[in-house]
From Swiss-Prot:
Gene3D superfamilies: Nucleic acid-binding proteins, Recombination protein O, C-terminal domain. One of its GO terms (biological process) is double-strand break repair. The keyword DNA repair applies. It comes from Beutenbergia cavernae (strain ATCC BAA-8 / DSM 12333 / CCUG 43141 / JCM 11478 / NBRC 16432 / NCIMB 13614 / HKI 0122). This is DNA repair protein RecO. The keyword Methyltransferase does not apply. Keywords: DNA damage, DNA recombination, DNA repair. GO terms for cellular component: bacterial nucleoid. Involved in DNA repair and RecF pathway recombination. Belongs to the RecO family. InterPro entries: ARFGAP/RecO, DNA_rep/recomb_RecO_N, NA-bd_OB-fold, RecO, RecO_C.
């Protein structure tokens, strides 16, 4: 396979030499791909502006030994234009693409569900369909679920006892009954558990109707759950403006 086409989200870029950029892409069919875009930093470049983070693109690449080479680009959804000018949207989108990069670290391993989740989340941000923090927390929960780390917010994560329950532990997988609850477990409000379940399921009517107190509490639990499974903190998450 020398030349191939795919859709992609630009996760990250950095400069190479005087005129080139190295791109980290999450593609629809080929997973995470690293590629060089030659000459895109020149003002005469035909597609430099199309290769900014958060954009959804259709591109043709030449498969190289270490880095692929971008040979053609078309814009499918210029979400970056709507996102980069708004601090809340920008920091939220940055946390999303950093998460996507971490969850798809094995290059060229297909990750179509992760790609589709990210595209949908970026679209929701760009269209301001919901509060940015809700979109972020929903994306984080669902992307972790796709990666095999789905939390439970109703039945006990340890013994499967039917809920609802009032304790939460990120290391143990979510909600816990009184018998399984370890010392120091969080005790979120019942409304927070409902919100978390709605965000995981994509129940936007319930999520949009939630109040700020429960949004803040749910965001803290989502961040703890994410950090536990990624085994490190997202650099970008600390900059996100929480409700």
């Amino acid at each position: 396979m020398k030349l191939y086409r795919d859709e992609a989200v630009v996760l990250r870029t950095h400069k190479l030499g005087e005129a080139d950029r190295i791109l980290t892409l999450l593609t629809r069919h080929h997973g995470q791909v690293r590629a060089v875009a030659k000459g895109v930093r020149r003002t005469s470049s035909k597609f430099g502006a199309r290769l900014e983070p958060f954009g959804v693109i259709d591109l043709q690449l030449y498969a190289g030994r270490s880095l692929d080479v971008v040979t053609q680009v078309d814009t499918l959804a210029p979400h970056g234009r709507s996102i980069v000018g708004d601090y809340a949207l920008y920091t939220t989108a940055t946390a999303m693409v950093e998460t996507a990069e971490r969850l798809t670290e094995i290059e060229r391993e297909p990750a179509t569900q992760q790609y589709l989740l990210l595209v949908g989340a970026l679209r929701a941000l760009a269209e301001r369909a919901h509060a940015p923090t809700l979109v972020l927390d929903s994306y984080l929960l669902r992307s972790l679920a796709v990666a095999g780390w789905a939390p439970t917010f109703t039945d006990c994560a340890r013994c499967s006892r039917e809920g609802p329950h009032r304790a939460f532990s990120a290391p143990m997988g979510g909600a816990l009954c009184q018998a399984c609850r370890p010392p120091g477990a969080a005790a979120p409000a019942a409304e927070t558990f409902l919100l978390l379940g709605a965000l995981l399921a994509g129940d936007w009517a319930l999520a949009d109707a939630s109040d700020e107190r429960h949004r803040r509490e749910s965001s803290g639990l989502v961040a703890a759950y994410l950090q536990w499974h990624l085994e490190r903190q997202l650099r970008s998450l600390r900059h996100v403006e929480r409700a």
